[in-house]
Amino acid sequence: MRKPFQFVTAIASALLINSVAALPDRVGDFSLLDSEGDFHQLSRYRHQDALVLMSYDSSCSSIDGALAQFKTMQSAFADQQVSFALINSSLEANIENIRAERARLGADFSLLLDSGQLVSETLSLSKTGELAILDPDRLTIVYRGGIEAAASQVLMDEIQGDVDSTTVMQANGCDIQYPAKRQHTDLVPDYATEIAPIIGEQCASCHREGGIGPFAMDSHLMLQGWSPMIREVLLTKRMPPTQVDPNIGHFSNARYISDSDLQKLVHWIDAGAPKGVAAVDPLTEIQFPDRREWQLGEPDYVITAPKHEVPATGVLDYINVDVDLPFEEDKWVKAVQYIAGDESVLHHLLSYVTAPQEVAEGEAAQGNVATRFLEGYAPGKVDAMTFPENTGVFIPEGHKLSMQFHYTTNGRATSDETILGLYMYDEPPMYENFTQSVSGMFRIPPYEQDYEASARYVFN
């Protein structure tokens, strides 16, 4: 009676093995900025049937011929739901020279900057002029190789939904060098001296017990267990949470992470996230200051916000509340500090000084709006805010504080009762610290892709 069962099991197992083996190679999600600072993420091309990338290096002698073929291929598929882009992973690439290259090419496709080479590594690109045809929905690569008839055929099959494996063909062109990968293959980055310091500097303040991060990065074991997720959010630029172009201006509190540090982290994870030989785990030694202490001493006035119950699950609407202030005279705020009741769920908080009958619209305001914005709270922003010298936020007599709360659930029901400490001037400062909103609410039309919105304000 057991033999038929064993026979059926064997057939089912064989079919399962064959079906798994036939799938295209998964590359996972990733993100890059292009020469104009625009953000490109593979999964955001899911409205397209395919994304075609070609490795590019202007110093390669054969690149012009490959580029001509690439443009021809793009023209052939112009009426299809296919996007084309170049990916520059040259070690000499930087924002200035790829902008110059983009202008010289005059092409209608993007030039992506892969300065850390991690995306090119993930796609296993080895030659300039090499193609990678990607399925943005399944996050797989269906073709890698030269620009030839086979590439066009695979792309046509992908559009029809008929691709069930990855086609790999030989590519001609200049070799792409990966010195960081080679170095880290020979000598894996050390956890204690190289990896843990990056995590401590960039991640641990939020990813700690009781923090807003979904898990604590407080030991090698935790880091190793979450390493696939860490790799993914690094390559998609979700973390560290700095979704701004580092090549335009400078944000003093942005947690930019260097290409070198990214390479160390990703290559360490790819090597299995080894602990090394250090006797002490540096992440277990990190001490955080008491977040419930007043950093500037006892405030002149403490505001206790209404208590909010946060459920274990669900998506919560913003909560807008007004808090009456007891001041019987005008006040000027010199500094402010928030102390979150439960920072593991408080995503952000905004506060405005408003007149008795005024409704603070926050982000819903239309057009240019001038407000007495007091200060905001966001994950990682735990220091007291002292306004610039001789400036302060004005609170006229009889005005109130309008506050907006945004909570994110984390699987555990809790409550939040945040407090604010206000530090006042004894005498009015020379200038009022005023906030000007350049734009308010804008509407994205249904099904609109890559919708752009802009606004301007002229200072008189």
Model-identified regions with their sequence ranges:
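Aromatic- and Gly/Pro-enriched helix-to-coil junctions and flexible linker segments
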Residues: 168-323, 398-404
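Short active-site neighborhood of thiol/selenol oxidoreductases, capturing the structured segment around
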Residues: 43-64
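Bacterial N-terminal signal peptides
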Residues: 8-18
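Structural microenvironment flanking redox-active thiols in thiol-disulfide oxidoreductases
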Residues: 64-105, 113-122
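N-terminal "domain-start" segment that seeds a small globular fold
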Residues: 21-43, 55, 174, 179, ...
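Beta-strand-centric surfaces of beta-sandwich/beta-rich domains
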Residues: 241, 246-251, 280-460
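Thiol/selenol-based redox catalytic cores and closely related redox-interacting motifs
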Residues: 114-177
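Structural micro-motif
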Residues: 28, 106-110, 124-132, 152, ...
